[in-house]
Amino acid sequence: MSNEFFALDSEGGDPIWYLQVLMTIKASGDKTGGALGLLDFRTPAGQTPLHIHHKEDEGWYLLDGRVSCTCGDETVSATPGAFLWLPRDVPHRLRFETECHLLQIAIPAGLEVFHKKMGQPAPRIELPPPGQALDTEKYKRLAAEHGLEIIQLPQWDEQEARK
């Protein structure tokens, strides 16, 4: 772990393709002394699984697009400039109603390690080609290792898993 100053320009970070998402790790635990992870997300329309983080709280700042967020029993719609706070141990899901650009902060750091293990280095700074299949066994195993509880996969993932 490090607790030294660091800075990235707008092109800096570690870009990853994870299913249909381009995520760029802007700050990881090894750069922030474990305090937080910050990722830049670019997504097509779609949704995350219904899941619970047991190790970190999660915040999202929406830069572009429309998102519907369910956290516990509440559902809200978000537009650019909105901030969503998802506390640990509460089930939640994001539905990206359009292509979206968001910043994700995880406190403490560690969630970025899960994303890096699930994804692959992005050869280009653009959304991955459509049709990336989810390896559900790897996903569930890594999720459990990183304190994530998967309650329900998105329907398109469930259909892929049955093939």
Regions found by a protein language model. Name each.
Residues 99-146:
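A contiguous, mid-protein "functional segment" used to position or interact
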Residues 67, 82, 116:
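Hydrophobic small-molecule pocket/channel-lining residues, especially in calycin-type beta-barrels
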Residues 22-25, 39-53:
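Conserved short histidine dyad/triad with adjacent acidic residue
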